[in-house]
Amino acid sequence: MADKALHTPPPSTLRNNSYPGPPPATPKLPSRRALLEGGNRGNPTRPPPRPLKPREYDYDEDDEKENQGPGQEKPPAKEEEEEEEEEERPNWDLHHLLQKWGADIDKLKDKVCRDLDSYKQKLGIRL
């Protein structure tokens, strides 16, 4: 039995690794300062890259005329009317938005006044 113990290799060499001895130590965690400062990731003086803008394609409707049958073309007068409507629409949208904001501000003002009146009542302040 003593002969068998002398001929058995140490347990570290029985594993499937190419080096004898204990396994390597676990790597150390980065310091707290390195984690807070971002470590070595990129150059801290450069801002992150901006996202790409979506490409705007200019489609020419005239290119598609060969795919239209006779009588499907719009008369030029309608195109001019549509352009005029598009020019007037932003003014209408702006006017509508300003009216909505005005109504929202009035509602907020009324709510703040009601809240302040209720605080005065709770505190027993009467003027």
From Swiss-Prot:
Cellular component GO terms, alphabetical: host cell cytoplasm; host cell nucleus
Chain positions covered by the region annotation Disordered: 1-94
Disulfide bonds: none
Subcellular location, principal: host cell
Subunit structure: Assembles into oligomeric complexes. Interacts with host CDK1. Interacts with host SRPK1; this interaction may favor expression of late viral transcripts. Interacts with host cytokeratin components KRT8 and KRT18.
Additional facts recorded: The major E4 form is first synthesized as an E1^E4 fusion protein from spliced E1^E4 transcripts, such that the first few amino acids of the E4 protein are derived from the N terminus of E1.
Family: Belongs to the papillomaviridae E4 protein family.
Name under which the protein is recorded: Protein E4
Gene this protein is translated from: E4
